[in-house]
C-alpha cells in the first residue's frame, strides 16, 4: 500500500511527522504538505501564483500552497506511481462540529476523495499524545480500507489527548456544533494602526450523546463520515412548496 500524507499545520509540524513514522511501519509513505502553517485554509486552491514543490532529502515534498493544493498537485501528475490512500493530519487540535467547514486537514482528505481515492482526516484533541492518534490510524486502516473503497465520503477521526491505553474505544458519531464564534480581537500595532485577530473557537453548544464532541469528551475516538455534498435534503420539499405557493398568488 502507498499512502499520501498531508496536513494543514505544515510539513515540520510534530503531528505529521509522528503520523508518517508510524504509517511507514505498515505502508510506503510519501509526504506532500504545506511549507508553513495553513490552518483554516479549508478547500482553497492557489490560482494566482505558481506552486513550487521542494524535494527534501528523504524523498518527501513541501509546497508553497494550501493543503488542497498539495493533494491536488500530488494526485494530478506530480507524483509518479499509484497512490492507494490519502491520510491528512495529525492536526494539533480537534476538528469536530463546525470546525469541519474551515479545516484544512479535512480539505486535504476531501481533495483526495474528490480525485477518486479513499481518504482519512485525523485530529488530536490537544498537542501531547500524537503517538496515540498515529496508533489509532494504523490500527484502523487495515480494518477500514475495503470499506473506504466503497464510500463517497471521507472518514473524520478525532482522538482524545490521552495515552493509548486510556482510550475507552471507538464511536461512530454525527457532528455536533458550536455556539456563535467569539468576537474578533482588536489591537494596536507598533505603528499605532488598528489590527484584528480572528478570535478563538466558541464552546460546543451541541455536545449531546451521539456527537463527536460527546465521544471525545468521554474518552472515545470519534469516527464521522463526511461528504462534500452540502445539500440540505430535508429542506428541499418545504422550500419547493413555499416557492410554488409564492408564485401562484
UniProtKB/Swiss-Prot annotation:
SUPFAM superfamilies: SurE-like (SSF64167)
Keywords, alphabetical: Cytoplasm, Hydrolase, Metal-binding, Nucleotide-binding
GO cellular component, one term: cytoplasm
Pfam families linked to this entry: SurE
Cell compartments where the protein resides: Cytoplasm
Family membership noted in the UniProt record: Belongs to the SurE nucleotidase family.
Name recorded for this polypeptide: 5'-nucleotidase SurE
Gene assigned in the entry: surE
Amino acid at each position: 500500500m502507498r499512502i499520501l500524507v498531508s496536513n494543514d499545520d505544515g510539513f515540520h509540524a510534530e503531528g505529521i511527522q509522528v503520523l508518517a513514522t508510524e504509517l511507514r511501519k505498515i505502508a510506503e509513505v510519501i509526504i506532500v504538505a504545506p511549507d508553513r502553517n495553513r490552518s483554516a485554509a479549508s478547500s482553497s486552491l492557489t490560482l494566482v501564483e505558481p506552486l513550487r514543490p521542494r524535494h527534501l532529502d528523504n524523498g518527501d515534498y513541501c509546497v508553497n500552497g494550501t493543503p488542497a493544493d498539495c493533494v491536488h498537485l500530488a494526485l494530478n501528475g506530480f507524483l509518479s506511481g499509484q497512490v492507494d490512500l490519502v491520510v491528512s493530519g495529525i492536526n494539533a487540535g480537534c476538528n469536530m462540529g463546525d470546525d469541519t467547514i474551515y479545516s484544512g486537514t479535512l480539505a486535504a482528505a476531501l481533495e483526495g476523495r474528490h480525485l477518486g481515492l479513499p481518504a482519512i482526516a485525523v485530529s488530536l484533541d490537544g498537542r501531547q499524545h500524537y503517538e496515540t492518534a498515529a496508533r489509532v490510524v494504523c490500527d484502523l486502516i487495515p480494518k477500514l480500507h475495503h470499506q473506504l473503497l466503497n464510500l463517497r465520503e471521507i472518514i473524520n477521526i478525532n482522538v482524545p489527548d490521552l495515552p493509548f491505553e486510556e482510550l475507552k474505544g471507538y464511536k461512530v458519531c454525527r457532528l455536533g456544533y458550536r455556539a456563535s464564534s467569539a468576537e474578533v480581537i482588536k489591537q494596536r500595532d507598533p505603528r499605532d494602526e488598528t489590527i484584528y485577530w480572528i478570535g478563538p473557537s466558541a464552546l460546543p453548544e451541541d455536545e449531546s450523546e451521539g456527537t463527536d464532541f460527546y465521544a471525545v469528551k468521554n474518552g472515545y475516538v470519534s469516527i464521522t463520515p463526511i461528504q462534500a455534498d452540502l445539500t440540505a435534503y430535508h429542506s428541499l420539499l418545504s422550500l419547493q412548496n413555499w416557492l410554488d405557493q409564492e408564485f401562484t398568488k
